[in-house]
Amino acid sequence: MKIMRKNHPMLKIINHSFIDLPTPSNISSWWNFGSLLGICLMIQILTGLFLAMHYTSDTATAFSSVVHICRDVNYGWLIRYLHANGASMFFICLFIHVGRGIYYGSYVLSETWNIGIILLLTTMATAFVGYVLPWGQMSLWGATVITNLLSAIPYIGNTLVEWIWGGFSVDKATLTRFFAFHFILPFIITAFVLVHLLFLHETGSNNPSGLNSDSDKIPFHPYYTIKDLLGILLLLMTLIILALFFPDALGDPDNYTPANPLNTPAHIKPEWYFLFAYAILRSIPNKLGGVLALILSILILATFPLLNTSKQHGLIFRPISQTIYWTFVANLLVLTWIGGQPVEYPFTMIGQIASIFYFTIIIILMPVSNTIENNIMKF
């Protein structure tokens, strides 16, 4: 078996990627989230495939088909809730994965980092079009509000919105194409994941100390396969508890009302994992400015390799940068909370302050703290 694993053309690739892969001996549990994201993606594709077998992408029957899945299909309710809550677990793992990358300076592996940003954007797009499919109130109005933002683009905005809608409002054509996008995007994500891994294995993994670990590597299997297995079991346990006991904890009650274009919900808001970006969008009174801030809130991650001036790798030995990092995390949680609140005082004011702080921390405070720490350490 060992000879076959090392010589067979197909098994050799798998062997070099998952079995005999040289891995730093000191990587912590924060490095588990890459494999957890892979498991989340597999769960989403499998449950999504079974849901697609029973779903109809027509405005007249979409809501009823989801009800049919929950009531009449064998374990349809379980598949639906695993898929809906699986998306939340996916984003929790995704945010922690990005957060770990920032904390431990993984952004210096710029190719892997940039593919990761593309993956984040593609996953957000997939989740957005997926939220429209049940055709509840929040599905319709969320799709209307978010797609309407494109009308802020000068000259071509309105034409672009109508082109995406396939008409003059979010209707049957929009739902059909969103279903097509939601079906194909996970496979595009899978392709990007392979490219992400390809670039990662070119350079090798980062590690908590931030030092070169070429002199101290161990094989990925069995050491990290066992470690990942524990993470996978904890993830599955959390997901199953969520799907069985609290299936609607992270959803919106408005989405249990069939879509009605004549009745606007009191508070239109996206799923919880988009609330931080939604708060940044709402904090700017100008429509185009809000859209640009929304896009920049994600694309600003690409500036990390450019703004990094520290002579040390990661934040593990840098207390000033650590303080700024955890302030940034707290600020993100504030933005997430504000995104779910109504547009009124004091929430608008808090949102504006938190949005300014979000960009200030990344563009000004982090590079300044790098320079201060370099001077203290006399680098």
Swiss-Prot record:
Keywords: Electron transport, Heme, Iron, Membrane, Metal-binding, Mitochondrion, Mitochondrion inner membrane, Respiratory chain, Transmembrane, Transmembrane helix, Transport, Ubiquinone. Its main location: mitochondrion. CDD domains: cytochrome_b_C, Cytochrome_b_N. One of its GO terms (cellular component) is respiratory chain complex III. A ubiquinone binds at H201. Its cofactor is heme b. Heme b b562 binds at H83, H182. It is found in: Mitochondrion inner membrane. The keyword RNA-binding does not apply. One of its GO terms (molecular function) is metal ion binding. Pfam families: Cytochrom_B_C, Cytochrome_B. The cytochrome bc1 complex contains 11 subunits: 3 respiratory subunits (MT-CYB, CYC1 and UQCRFS1), 2 core proteins (UQCRC1 and UQCRC2) and 6 low-molecular weight proteins (UQCRH/QCR6, UQCRB/QCR7, UQCRQ/QCR8, UQCR10/QCR9, UQCR11/QCR10 and a cleavage product of UQCRFS1). This cytochrome bc1 complex then forms a dimer. This is Cytochrome b. Heme 1 (or BL or b562) is low-potential and absorbs at about 562 nm, and heme 2 (or BH or b566) is high-potential and absorbs at about 566 nm. Component of the ubiquinol-cytochrome c reductase complex (complex III or cytochrome b-c1 complex) that is part of the mitochondrial respiratory chain. The b-c1 complex mediates electron transfer from ubiquinol to cytochrome c. Contributes to the generation of a proton gradient across the mitochondrial membrane that is then used for ATP synthesis. The gene is MT-CYB. It is a multi-pass membrane protein.
